[in-house]
Amino acid sequence: MEVIKTAIEGLVIIEPKVFKDARGYFFESFSQREFEEKVRKVNFVQDNESMSSYGVMRGLHFQRPPYTQSKLVRCVKGRVLDVAVDIRKGSPTYGQHVAVELSEDNHRQFFVPRGFAHGFAVLSETAVFQYKCDNFYAPEADGGISIKDESLGIDWQIPTDKALLSEKDIKHLCLKDFDSPFDYSVNLYPEFE
C-alpha cells in the first residue's frame, strides 16, 4: 500500500496495490501490521457500512472523549467526496479540511484520526461506504459540525436543491459557535503511550 500525506498532519490517503487480470482484480484492503508500520498504531474494533443515494450528505461527525474514534473509510460502490475537518483547539490547522474522492474505481482509503470531524457527500447514483472505527459507537458522545458551514470552504459538489441531510445533521452548529472537546496539546491515543 502507498501512503499519501495530505496538507494536514495525520490525515492520509491510502492507495492499495491492485492486481488486475482477465478475471478481475484483487487487493489487500487492510493489514494491521502494514498500517501500523506506515501510518500509526491503532486497534480497529467496529466495521460499519452505509448505502446512500445521490445528494446524501452525512456529517460532519465525531465522538467526544473518552469515546473518540479514528476512522479508516472507503467507498466500495459508486463515488463520494470524503472530508475531514481539524477540530483540535490550538492546532495550526484548526478549522481546515482535506477533501478526497473515494470510489469503487480508485480503491482509495482515507484515514481520519481522532480530533477530526468527518463527513461525505454521495456523487454517484448510489454509493456503498465502509469504515473501520477504533472505538465503539457511543450515542451519548455523538457530536457534529454543520456540513453547511460556509466558513469551512468545502465544495461538496452537490447543488443545494439536491442535498439530502438527516434532521440530526441539519441541527449541528457552525464551527464559530462550537466549543471543541479536543485539544491539540493532549495525546488522543493514550493507550499507546
Give the residues covered by each predicted segment.
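Non-catalytic, conserved peripheral segments adjacent to functional cores
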Residues: 1-105, 124-126, 133-142, 146-193
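Short beta-strand His + acidic residue motifs that chelate non-heme Fe in jelly-roll/DSBH
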Residues: 110, 118-123
